[in-house]
UniProtKB/Swiss-Prot annotation:
Family annotation (InterPro entries): PurS (IPR003850), PurS-like_sf (IPR036604)
Species annotation: Thermotoga maritima (strain ATCC 43589 / DSM 3109 / JCM 10099 / NBRC 100826 / MSB8)
NCBIfam families reported in the protein's UniProt record: phosphoribosylformylglycinamidine synthase subunit PurS
Name of the molecule in the record: Phosphoribosylformylglycinamidine synthase subunit PurS
PANTHER family, per the entry: PHOSPHORIBOSYLFORMYLGLYCINAMIDINE SYNTHASE SUBUNIT PURS
Length: 82
């Protein structure tokens, strides 16, 4: 069966605070003197999936996101094929 590679980019929804991102943003601006206007953290998950075709592989990745990898209440995600 073919192997498909995906990256899932996850970050907080825009209406959810990102305390770690806010702290890093403040340190870069105030302590390091860098002109950082806005910083938000996220995570990237890389997955390799065996499936019959690309569409089935994408369905598997989407199911993994919805059931475990992403908290839809506070996070949003985007899937990219690698």
């Amino acid at each position: 069966m073919p192997l498909f590679k995906f990256a899932i980019d996850v970050q907080y929804r825009s209406n959810v605070r990102d305390p770690r991102g806010e702290t890093i943003e403040r340190v870069l601006r105030e302590e390091k003197g860098l002109p950082v206007k806005k910083l938000r953290l996220g995570k990237s998950i890389h997955l390799e999936v065996e499936a019959e075709n690309k569409e089935k592989a994408y369905e598997i990745v989407k199911k993994a996101c919805e059931e475990l990898l992403v908290n839809p209440v506070v996070e949003e995600y985007e899937v990219r094929e690698l």
